């Protein structure tokens, strides 16, 4: 398939976080929206449309599925900006491509702009000068609901250090830098394997079953086989993720 892993690749690490997957009624259109916004090239394959990550940036995958669930989703993206003008440009580009503004009660002095993409998924364009996301790249963070325990699980699963651990909130980041993945400290609501957003992990140069056992030993559980060379698993909060052979 020619995947570009691009996220903290290390030959000694089995599980690689290749992408965050989004279910959507129109994978091609939503992938093109994000490809334009992030400056990436979409790659079509048997699992949908992938926007590979590079230079520490987490990949995004768009897969055919039902309409997004109503209400706020448990995961959203944080895009960075280099200046106020750049932030305004990113927002204007997103709206021109089909995004819409979203009022979640945020105050003007907070600085960030909340939007909904054409698939109904929330994301934020963060104000310039945000020290927490400094140097993380255009896709600064994947922000998730989830407990401190699940943040610790993913740190061990990916061999990514905790870069934030305060008041039950956690965040991990590849040793090579790039996109952070963060959890709010609050329990996430699982949809029993039908979550429209999930992590996609690849076992690089190792045994799929052995890696599934390793993750289970860290607190995950097997849900079911999901096709040849794919195992659907759940993290300690019960949130589904896909583990597949390279």
Annotate each predicted stretch with a short phrase.
Residues 6-45, 51-103, 116-167, 172-224, ...:
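Glyoxalase I/VOC metalloenzyme domain signal
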Residues 108-110, 226-228:
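Short, small/polar residue-rich loop motifs at catalytic or cofactor-binding pockets
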């Amino acid at each position: 398939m020619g995947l570009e892993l691009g996220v903290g690749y290390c030959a000694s690490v089995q599980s690689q976080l290749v992408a965050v997957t989004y279910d959507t009624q129109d994978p091609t259109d939503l992938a093109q929206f994000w490809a334009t916004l992030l400056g990436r090239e979409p790659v079509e394959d048997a699992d949908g449309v992938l926007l590979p990550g590079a230079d520490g940036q987490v990949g995004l995958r768009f897969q055919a599925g039902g309409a997004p669930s109503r209400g706020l989703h448990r995961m959203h993206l944080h895009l960075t900006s280099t200046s106020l003008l750049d932030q305004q440009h990113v927002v204007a580009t997103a709206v021109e491509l089909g995004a819409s503004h979203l009022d979640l009660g945020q105050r003007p002095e907070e600085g960030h702009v909340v939007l909904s993409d054409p698939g109904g998924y929330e994301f934020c364009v963060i104000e310039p000068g945000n020290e927490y996301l400094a140097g993380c790249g255009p896709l600064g963070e994947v922000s998730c609901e989830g407990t401190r325990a699940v943040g610790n699980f993913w740190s061990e699963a990916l061999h990514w250090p905790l870069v934030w651990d305060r008041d039950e909130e956690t965040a991990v980041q590849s040793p090579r830098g790039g996109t952070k993945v963060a959890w709010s400290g609050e329990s996430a609501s699982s949809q029993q394997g039908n979550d429209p957003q999930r992590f996609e992990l690849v076992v690089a140069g190792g045994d799929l079953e052995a890696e599934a056992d390793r993750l289970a030993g860290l607190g995950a559980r097997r849900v079911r086989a999901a096709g040849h060379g794919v195992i659907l698993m759940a993290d300690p909060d019960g949130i589904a993720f896909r583990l597949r052979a390279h």
